[in-house]
């Protein structure tokens, strides 16, 4: 155990002693290589972008070249124009990020430009999210989006089972109903989904929590650093990542935000930088580990033990 702790400490020191600019570039390249779903389903663009990213990892000098990132940004731009109507929003964000790296690496002070623009991209992402959700989508503010998601998305069924009294039969009914509605063979115009009042209440709570924390993040990252309140921006972004993606493991967007968060960290903020680095495997654990089923089994066992003890 002692040797394991020693190895982990040494690994942490190696990461923290890395050049911050190199760390950000490697994190971006790993994001592009390790998350194919972030690039969409078009194999041509995946092949080019991921191959370039592999080259950037294996040849660090290429990854620090402005020409490399101009090429990457150009490919992303062509992809965005070619498939704008089906492209996820985080791909547009990555397009801007590659352009940021290209411009920054063309200057004498790339670290400062990267940090400032990463902060700006985070703030703008959240302010536009709040604008769309809070002011332009009244159905969202009623909780309809999360209510529908909690009823029909298998990724969050564990939350409904553990916290809201949903059972597997209700979810199976909802999945079958949505499949029937989507089938071109069925002449069905509407279906009735099964839920619970607690699930509806949770949807409203999550809706307002999302708008509030995203609004706070927009404020923290767009305000100039001279305001004392901005000292909490990193903690707020980490809190958002640790809580949001536990409930909804959208790791692609989560890793993108964490990469931007890492990029805007002050060079002397070693502990904060380490927290951002450790968030990468944490979000991966959210995606791969059956966390909610394990919690459900633990809760069931605890309840059974309590009932047994009562008798």
Model-derived regions, located:
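N-terminal membrane topogenic signal
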Residues: 2-27, 272-273
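Functionalized membrane-embedded alpha-helices
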Residues: 26-36, 44-76, 99, 117-133, ...
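Membrane-interface helix caps and helix-loop-helix hairpins in membrane proteins
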Residues: 39-42, 80-91, 108-111, 243-253
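Hydrophobic alpha-helical segments and helix pairs
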Residues: 89-113, 117-118
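Membrane-interfacial entry segments at the cytosolic side of transmembrane helices
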Residues: 112-119, 268-281
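Membrane-interfacial catalytic/cofactor-binding modules of polytopic membrane enzymes
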Residues: 127-212, 296-305, 310-311
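Hydrophobic alpha-helical segments
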Residues: 249-277, 290
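Final/C-terminal transmembrane alpha-helix of multipass membrane proteins
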Residues: 276-294
């Amino acid at each position: 155990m002692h040797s394991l702790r020693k190895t982990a400490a040494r690994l942490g020191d190696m990461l923290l002693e890395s050049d911050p600019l190199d760390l950000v570039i490697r994190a971006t390249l790993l994001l592009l290589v390790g998350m194919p779903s972030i690039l969409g389903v078009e194999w041509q663009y995946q092949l080019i972008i991921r191959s370039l990213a592999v080259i950037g990892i294996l040849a660090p000098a290429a990854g620090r070249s402005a020409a490399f990132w101009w090429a990457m940004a150009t490919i992303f731009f062509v992809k965005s124009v070619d498939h704008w109507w089906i492209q996820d929003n985080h791909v547009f964000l990555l397009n801007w990020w590659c352009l940021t790296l290209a411009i920054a690496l063309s200057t004498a002070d790339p670290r400062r430009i990267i940090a400032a623009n990463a902060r700006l991209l985070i703030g703008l992402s959240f302010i536009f999210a709040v604008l769309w959700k809070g002011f332009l989508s009244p159905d969202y503010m009623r909780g309809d989006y999360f209510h529908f998601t909690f009823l029909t998305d298998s990724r969050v069924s564990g939350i409904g089972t553990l916290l809201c009294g949903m059972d597997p039969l209700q979810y199976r009914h909802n999945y079958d109903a949505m499949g029937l509605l989507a089938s071109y063979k069925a002449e069905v115009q509407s279906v009735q989904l099964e839920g619970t009042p607690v699930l509806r209440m949770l949807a409203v709570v999550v809706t307002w929590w999302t708008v509030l924390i995203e609004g706070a993040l927009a404020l923290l990252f767009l305000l100039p650093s001279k305001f004392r309140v901005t000292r909490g921006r990193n903690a707020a972004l980490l809190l958002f990542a640790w809580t949001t993606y536990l409930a909804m493991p959208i790791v692609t967007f989560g890793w993108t935000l964490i990469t931007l968060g890492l990029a805007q960290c002050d060079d002397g903020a070693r502990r904060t930088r380490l927290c951002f680095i450790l968030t990468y495997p944490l979000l991966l654990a959210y995606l791969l580990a059956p966390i909610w089923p394990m919690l459900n089994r633990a809760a069931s066992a605890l309840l059974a033990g309590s009932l047994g003890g009562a008798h």
